[in-house]
């Protein structure tokens, strides 16, 4: 197993984690978002090729928990609504809405 260092916005831990885990009571959504965000950072782009099975294996969650988490993340505007790619190899768009607010 290789270890990569990742640099994530403080907003993810200071605001998003308490919001998703505490307020929304969706810790799986935070875990899935953290995985997708880390993968996006590693790839250097906002689109991450990741099937339900891949996300489940990488996070330790069940596929059904990943599905529920992705639905919640889409509703919250943290993952793009439209999946690109194929059903077997979907590409998920990772959104960072707080960056738009900070830039405004």
Where are these regions (language model features)?
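Short recognition helix of helix-turn-helix/winged-helix DNA-binding domains
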Residues: 1-57, 87
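Winged-helix/helix-turn-helix nucleic-acid-interaction surface
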Residues: 62-104
């Amino acid at each position: 197993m290789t270890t990569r260092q990742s640099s994530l916005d403080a907003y993810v831990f200071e605001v998003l984690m308490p919001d998703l885990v505490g307020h929304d009571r969706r810790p799986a959504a935070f875990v899935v978002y953290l995985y997708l965000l880390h993968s996006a950072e590693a790839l250097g782009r906002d689109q991450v090729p990741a099937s339900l099975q891949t996300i489940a294996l990488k996070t330790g969650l069940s596929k059904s928990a990943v599905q529920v988490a992705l639905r919640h993340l889409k509703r919250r505007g943290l993952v793009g609504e439209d999946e690109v790619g194929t059903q077997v190899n979907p590409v998920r768009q990772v959104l960072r809405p707080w960056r738009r607010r900070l830039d405004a």
